[in-house]
Amino acid sequence: MSSQPRKILVTSALPYANGSIHLGHLLEHIQTDIWTRFQRMCGHEIYSVCADDAHGTPVMLKAQELGITPEEMVARTREEHHQDLLDFFVEYDNYHVTHSDENKELSELIYNRLNDAGYISKRTISQLFDPEKNMFLPDRFVKGTCPSCGAEDQNGDSCDNCGATYDPTEMKNPRSVVSGATPILKDSEHFFFDLPQFSDMLQNWLKSDALQSEISNKLEEWFEKGLQQWDISRDAPYFGFEIPGAPNKFFYVWVDAPVGYMASFKNLCDRSGINFDEYWGADSDAELYHFIGKDITYFHCLFWPAMLEGAGFRKPTGVNVHGFVTVNGAKMSKSKGTFIKGRTYLEHLNPEYLRYYFASKLGANVTDIDLNFEDFAQKVNSDLVGKVVNIASRCASFITKRFDGKLSDNVLEPALVAEFQHAQASIAQAFEERQYHKAIREIMALADKANQFIDANAPWVTIKDESKQAFTHDVCSLGINLFRLLMVYLKPVVPKLAEQAEAFLNDDLSWSSAQSVLTGHEINKFKALMQRVDMDKVNAMVDDSKENLAPTVTLDPNSPLAKDPISDTIEFDDFAKIDLRIAKIVVAEHVEKADKLLRLELDLGGETRQVFAGIKSAYQPEDLVGKLTVMVANLAPRKMRFGMSEGMVLAAGPGGKDLWIMEPHEGAQPGMKVK
């Protein structure tokens, strides 16, 4: 790691202005803030900027829904986002918004330079159009049936069921999410950026140290398919910046969103006298880093550097990509209460719990981070409270009560102090490389050694022996110094705790101060620095995050529920009469002269039943043997011309090939009752 002062500009991806900050956002902002604070502690000149991403159809429609202008909604949301981040101790030098004069000026400048250089072209394309709302529909505002697998209610550009990607015009039974109307095809002239012209430059850039290897490898797929021209325009009505010289044509949000990094920094420069070109000019020797999530990689690693190159600006030094946040091993869920907004978290828990936990799991790769609440409580309570803060609380009272609040002039074990100080280099390297989990692991190993030292010397015992007062003073003073070193290393992660420690220690914690020891130094009276995580508060947070999603669901007229509505309500006693059991299919065979039936022999775990099931159109008999399914076991036997049917297997679907028998999860056994 360089010891020379560096000039660095850091950005985080811009939160979109139509929703609240949640834990997924916070992973990235905390990751960025830790790195920024570390660099600043090391004495480097670093600026961090962010902004709200304000443009696009979703913002326009949300504002209409609220009965306010998009500008009003964006201003309100930006204030909310910024305050949430501040309350998690995420401090940007500037937090701006993309609907700004600076962003309009820079977006037009970049576009005009690209256009003058011949990188912009126009052509007519056909798009889905909502005839009721009189607007073209972005991909996310079209739903329909997947053209690949036939799954219904899929997004306009990709299928959650089979993973296929496609053009919205390829969907079957498309409908507008805005009005529910069936969209029509309509022609419109669009503007395109000639991305293929930058193919060689981008491939060379991908091979540099700017990206993690897994990201570079993934992006190679784009070159294997061949880069395509990028549609950079959208038609009115649209909330955004109008393209110069093109009435009712607007920049696509992903054109001006990354320009928002430049605009936020320019806003800071104009207020603070910083030289903008020293950081964004083509010959800049400053470092520029973007922290982003893996879902927006291709915008930042293909389109954005090509735009910068074509417009005569510098490219990023590095794009640091992280994974998603899962909660308790699963995708965040509003119904389960694990889609947790930042403000809801703050109403229940200390923000530094989350900062520390994320740091303990964050590396420089793109792996998803799981927030397991039991592990979260155990790690924070064990590490921060039980190890680090405990060192100070075990030693401080003796210093205050017996030694007038002054540390000893003597350093009892210089070798132990030297070990703590020597670790600074490897901890710094881990922070520099964004291997926060390695830094935390090493810091906690040192905390263990500090506690072992205190345990071995037991000041609570020696304080009772008048002949060992000086020794006790030395032990507790060294304990306080070890705590101080740990807090220097943890300061980028838990800045508020470090601030409280500074007040207690009566000392400023800088990265360089780790090479000194406090002797004969007066400290202040110790106050509790951090409370343990209370699982009752965690559970209350989850409960407060649960949402009843039923009111937000709109019925798709082509959905199974619309075609086959729910039957009349029955009493529980009626349902309780049905005996559902797990059954194993041991025999499956065709029934001669039957068009729809298969004959099944079902093992109920001690009893075998014969059932004729109308699933021949969907299954080959050999594919069913060995499967577990669910059957109605107490249905009266029914005599058929092929034999006696002694029950019924359960299946879902409209019929034909679209039938699926019920299959229980692994662990179910034949004969088990389904309740």
UniProtKB/Swiss-Prot annotation:
Domain of life from the UniProt record: Bacteria
Domain tRNA-binding, chain residue ranges per copy: 574-675
Keyword Secreted: no
GO CC terms, sorted: cytosol
CDD domains linked: Anticodon_Ia_Met (cd07957), MetRS_core (cd00814), tRNA_bind_EcMetRS_like (cd02800)
Transmembrane helix recorded as keyword: no
Protein name, per record: Methionine--tRNA ligase
Stretches assigned to coiled coil: none
UniProt binding sites for ATP: K334
Gene Ontology biological process terms from the UniProt entry: methionyl-tRNA aminoacylation
Compartments, record wording: Cytoplasm
